[in-house]
Amino acid sequence: MGKPERKVRERINSSSSYFLRCFGVSRKIHSDKPIVDAGQEIQKTKKKTRTRWFSRPTKFRSKEEITPTSIYKSEKQKLTFEDDKQNLFRVIRHVTDRKNVATSGYKTVDHETKEKDTNEQRDINPEPLSFLGYDDKFYERVSTDGKLDPTNIVGSGSKPKEIREKSSRVRKRSRVSKLDPVIGISIIMLTLMIMLTWGRLCAILCTSTWCYIFPRLKEAATAVAVVNRKRSGSGKGEEGSFQGDLDLNSVAYKKKVVLEGFLVRQHRVSM
């Protein structure tokens, strides 16, 4: 009876050992153990393997949760996040300080230019940063320590006056171009008014000279001619008049001729 019992034990132990080896568990075979049924031993091995199989990953998970590396990583992340916050606050402070400085300098320049020309400053409405020539270099590069680069600060706002002069020239040209047609129309209207007024004056003067001055001048010329004839006459007539005073076409001469005719007739009748 001893030999078959040993064979049965060896078969059961070998099968259980192979089954357990599939799950990575080894077991030594002891020949002195009591005989156990195959079904009961398989159930025991399954229970053992289940407990061992599920016990190991739980331990591994608990170890992973308690490892110091994850805590160190979380602390590092917190520190980097805080450092980023501090750097951002520094950058914002420096940028705002630089903006305040730029606006203060712009105000001083504007105060000087307002005393020179107030009208130009009223018309100009520039943007705060683009007018001063602060391009992307104005937002200077910030180092890891939070300091500003002096090169970008020096060369950022060096040409505000030139830009201001150019803008004022452009404004003046636009105004002149808008006023050109108005000025031309006003000049044309003035010339027409002057021509009309002078034309009326010229017409009045011409008519007055033709109707009033010319006859007066003619009468004066005839009087002068009569005086000259009297002075140049050689003798007097019968009635004490100069021969040069006779005017055949005059009314006095005609009356004289008629009277003389009547006298001659009366003299003949009386004879």
Swiss-Prot record:
GO CC term, one of those recorded: membrane
Signal peptide: none
TM ranges: 179-199
Effect of residue 271 to T: In strain: cv. Cvi-0
Variant or mutagenesis effect after changing residue 13 to Y: In strain: cv. Cnt-1, cv. Ema-1 and cv. Tac-0
InterPro entries tied to this protein: At5g23160-like
Localization terms from the record: Membrane
Membrane topology, record value: Single-pass membrane protein
Keywords from the UniProt entry: Membrane, Transmembrane, Transmembrane helix
Superkingdom of origin organism: Eukaryota
Protein name, as recorded: Uncharacterized protein At5g23160
